[in-house]
A protein has these predicted regions:
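N-terminal membrane-anchoring/stem segments of glycan-assembly enzymes
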Residues: 1-92
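Internal catalytic domains of large membrane-associated glycosyltransferases
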Residues: 14, 67-297
Length: 297
């Protein structure tokens, strides 16, 4: 992977998007024309319209990811770097602090803390575990699970590497759910950390991955968020194993394809991402809208 900073001007970014969406449009148009030939002739006009509309929606979605994957394949084949990101050596020392956040809501405490311990041990092996702290942010409403969380936390603290702190906090009221949980953390403790890695309750991330994300954020001051593509693991059923295999085979290709045309304008998937705390606090607070959900609140 190239360590040089690749900057794309707006025109090149626009050209990338025109290519991907243009190919998607042409593919969908040709497929739709073919589809109209096989629609039963005795169908009503309304039925034909609905069949064509549903076909266009589903085929366009597939075509978008198909062409994104084609471009992603060549990006990986020629080892092109991510535009706008300067890659750094693996032994780059961190001078910043990162909080690893795991919001939970009536989860299995043993699994939550087992995953955190595994990640903490892996981080400690990198030799830079002291740059990270871990937080369990609980919105649990079940009293039994709440007690179990605290018990597991006390046990986990005894097993944690000495270089990494593990904190536990439960809110009495789970206002705004997960987003409110993250907001509460930022308001009370965000000033102590440069970055935060937001996990899901069942997330399991490699220590080297978390370290690399923190290194990239520290050395790319213009970057506000880096999203790690999630991958399914630990499945037992045949269907789950098939999903895991598929994700392993073409997951990186799809991710590279999305990065090809989204560049620096991608969306936050809700977890498995590192975020610049100060920028997040300054720019990502949303007002409460009038009216009832989903259009208000």
């Amino acid at each position: 992977m190239s360590e040089e900073l690749t900057v794309l001007n707006p025109k090149r970014i626009r050209n990338r998007r025109v290519k991907v969406f243009g190919l998607m449009f042409v593919s969908t148009l040709l497929a739709t024309i073919k589809w109209t030939y096989v629609i039963p002739t005795d169908s009503t006009l309304l039925t034909k319209f609905l069949m064509v509309a549903l076909f266009v929606l589903t085929f366009a979605w597939i075509a978008l990811f198909f062409w994104s994957s084609i471009f992603g394949f060549f990006e990986l084949l020629f080892r092109r770097g991510v535009p706008g990101i300067t890659w750094v050596p693996e032994d780059t020392k961190l001078s910043t602090r990162t909080a690893v956040l795991m919001p939970v809501y009536n989860e299995c405490s043993r699994d939550v803390f087992a995953n955190l311990l595994a990640m903490a041990d892996d981080l400690d092996k990198t030799g830079q575990g002291k740059a990270f702290d871990m937080f369990v942010l609980s919105d649990t409403t079940n009293p039994k699970l709440w007690v179990e969380e605290e018990r597991c936390w006390l046990e986990a603290k005894k097993l944690m590497p000495k270089t990494i702190n593990l904190y536990y906090r439960r809110r009495a009221k789970n206002t705004a759910r997960k987003s409110g949980n993250i907001e509460d953390f930022c308001v009370k403790w965000g000033c102590y950390y440069d970055f935060m890695i937001v996990l899901d309750a069942d997330s399991l991330m490699n220590g080297k991955t978390m370290l690399k994300m923190a290194q990239l954020m520290e050395n790319n001051q213009h970057t506000g968020i880096i999203q790690a593509p999630p991958m399914t693991v630990g499945g037992h059923t045949l269907f789950a194993r098939m999903q895991q295999f598929a994700g392993k085979v073409y997951g990186p290709i799809v991710a590279a394809g999305l990065a090809y045309w989204q560049v620096g304008d991608s969306n936050y998937w809700g977890h498995n991402a590192i975020i610049r705390v100060k920028a997040f606090m300054e720019c990502c607070g949303l007002p409460v809208l009038e009216g009832k959900a989903p259009f208000g609140g």
